[in-house]
């Protein structure tokens, strides 16, 4: 952290909460009054709107080589976060001009899981589904949820599994399972498992 910079920007040296989840990154400054534009990792940015404290870590080098504004983890108080013209934008306490906002470009955003609003019945945050094992009704393991993607009316589970190529070598493959009631029987977050009506050869 460069001397004198942290207080002027409202940055506070911190450490990530034990339940921290990476939810996006700062794309760029937005406007001239210290607002920033956010790239969320999920199509549902509700957690960004409810959390009053965000945690930032240095950008991936490919997004922002030579970043030196801070090192480690810092926290910021959020004055406001909202959607404007289809983009998520936010204003932090202590960041009041475009130069200050541009200085954060590329920073990775983390939130405490405890700050997420409660999901409705039969609704789940993507971050809670990633990493769950997927089994079908017969108990056959179909793989592990690597990611999800939005396809208009519903989400799709990207399930990664081990496979064997024609030459006998091991490889990793992926199957797509629509995350809809017609195929998903049960989601057990505590048990880290999703049961689906799906066959390995689909």
Swiss-Prot record:
PANTHER family: RIBOSOME MATURATION FACTOR RIMM. It is found in: Cytoplasm. Binds ribosomal protein uS19. The PRC barrel domain binds ribosomal protein uS19. Belongs to the RimM family. An accessory protein needed during the final step in the assembly of 30S ribosomal subunit, possibly for assembly of the head region. Essential for efficient processing of 16S rRNA. May be needed both before and after RbfA during the maturation of 16S rRNA. It has affinity for free ribosomal 30S subunits but not for 70S ribosomes. Pfam families: PRC_RimM, RimM. Keywords: Chaperone, Cytoplasm, Ribosome biogenesis, rRNA processing. GO terms for molecular function: ribosome binding. One of its GO terms (biological process) is rRNA processing. This is Ribosome maturation factor RimM. GO terms for cellular component: cytoplasm; ribosome. It comes from the Bacteria. Residues 121-202 form the PRC barrel domain. InterPro entries: PRC_barrel-like_sf, PRC_RimM, RimM, RimM_N, RimM_N_sf, Transl_B-barrel_sf.
């Amino acid at each position: 952290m460069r001397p004198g910079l942290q207080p002027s920007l409202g940055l506070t040296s911190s450490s990530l909460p034990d339940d921290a989840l990476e939810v996006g990154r700062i794309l760029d400054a937005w406007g001239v009054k210290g607002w920033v534009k956010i790239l969320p990792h999920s199509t549902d940015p509700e957690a960004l709107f409810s959390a009053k404290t965000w945690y930032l870590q240095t950008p991936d080098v490919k997004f922002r080589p030579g970043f030196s504004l801070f090192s480690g983890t810092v926290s910021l108080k959020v004055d406001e976060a909202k959607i404007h013209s289809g983009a998520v934008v936010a204003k932090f306490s202590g960041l009041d001009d475009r130069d200050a906002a541009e200085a954060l470009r590329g920073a990775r955003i983390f939130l405490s899981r405890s700050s997420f609003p409660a999901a409705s019945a039969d609704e789940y945050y993507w971050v809670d589904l990633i990493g769950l094992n997927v089994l079908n009704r017969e108990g056959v393991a179909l793989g592990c949820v690597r990611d999800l993607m939005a396809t208009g009316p519903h989400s799709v589970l990207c399930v990664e599994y081990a496979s064997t190529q024609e030459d006998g070598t091991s490889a990793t493959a992926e199957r797509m399972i629509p995350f809809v009631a017609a195929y998903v029987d049960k989601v057990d977050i505590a048990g880290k498992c999703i049961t689906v009506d799906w066959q390995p050869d689909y």
